[in-house]
Each structure stands twice: as structure tokens, then as C-alpha cells.
């Protein structure tokens, strides 16, 4: 496992700045682009062995940005920094020109949806797992969410349908069904930002293809970051960033990166054994 995959969601509650909420900015900038400026990070706080080493990149608003790289290259760490679970050891993360550390974390989390490798399924009904925290569930949004996540047929085949109780960590459902429920949860929220970390890696090819096609329409007008290794998940992204041992190796579109025949080309070639 990547070292950056082993940190749980509970880490978010340890952030010191959450004790200073009243001093935080309560409005996001009009420009929703995200900038990482000379970001260095390591989990143990030491000034060495950076998981991210002087990373500078821009995630443009209303576009799909994919992040790829070998295991341990720092992909998941970028997602956790974007979520506000941690702050950079050096450098800055900005929304337009506002530091993410200066934005109210409750506001920030309200505006984003995420599917992570350690996202949680609660001991509750399917409907309540999708529409988290909603006193009154919007049935139209619920149906849209399960359609996009390609899980409506499965749910409606169950005797209690959306009122079916599922257990902690998704007991009683497969890993693929869990991922589809988590995608439905993110879609139901209808956020301005979407962060997906290997959100479809447990799905078979047919389910993944259907969901990715559905998501392309849902992504319109949203700022999206997708961490993935499957070619099918990233090739249609507006921009692809290739990480190698915590540094940016190259970036561009799928077509541009394939033509360069460097890091991305090698990743894809090795994965698919195309012999290109």
C-alpha cells in the first residue's frame, strides 16, 4: 500500500485551524481554479523524504484534471491536501488567490464531493447512505444519483429497495456496489468540486464504462480531480498530470502525452501491454 493511502478520514478532525473557525473566510472566490504553488509535504513532518516535492500545478475550474503515476508517487496525498485533511509543509494551495488554509473548512467541505479509497458506508438504509444528513430526501435527485452511478437496477431488485439496511463498511454489498453507492452519494450532493481517488477500480469494465459516460455529463460546470490508473478513466480528461516520486514528470492531454513517449506512455504501455 502507498504510505499516503493508509491515513484515515478521521485525520480531518485533528486539524488545528478548525479551532479558529470564526477567523476564516466564508465565501469562495468567483474563480474556482485551484493552484498548488511549490507544495512540499511529508506525513511525519520531517524536512526530508517528501511525499510531494516542490509541486506546482493548476487545476482549472469547470474542467476534468486527472492525476496518474506509479504506486507511492503522491497521487492520494494531493487529494488529501485538497480536501484539507493536511496542510502543505511548504508552499501553498489556493482557490484563485485565496489560501485554502484561510477558508472555513466547513464551507469548503460543503462545496465538495469525494469518493476516496477509505470512504465510509454507514450502518443505515441505502437512501440515507446516499443522502447523508438530509432530513427530507429529494427523490428526484436520489433517482438521478443512482442512475448516474448505474446502481438503480440493483437497489430496486431488493425487497426493501432504498430502505434496505446495509452495515458498517458496507457489509452485505460487494466492493463494486459500495463504490457505486459512494459515487451516487457524491452525485446526490451536486457539489462544485469533485475529487475521485480510484473511484471505479473495483468495477468491471461494463459498469465502469456506463458510469464514466454518465459522469461526463454530470461534470459539466464542475471542477473535477480524478486519481486513477486505468486508461479508460483518464484518457478523456481535459488535462493529465503525471507524478513520479512526488514530482511532476509531465502534463498534457492523453494524445499529447502518448506522442511524447515518456512517463505516461510507459505507464499506459505497461498497464495494457499493448506493445505500442
Located regions from the model:
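ABC-type nucleotide-binding domain
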Residues: 16, 25-276
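Single conserved hydrophobic/aromatic residue that forms the stacking wall/gate
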Residues: 2-13
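Active-site phosphate-binding and catalytic loops of NTP-dependent enzymes
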Residues: 19
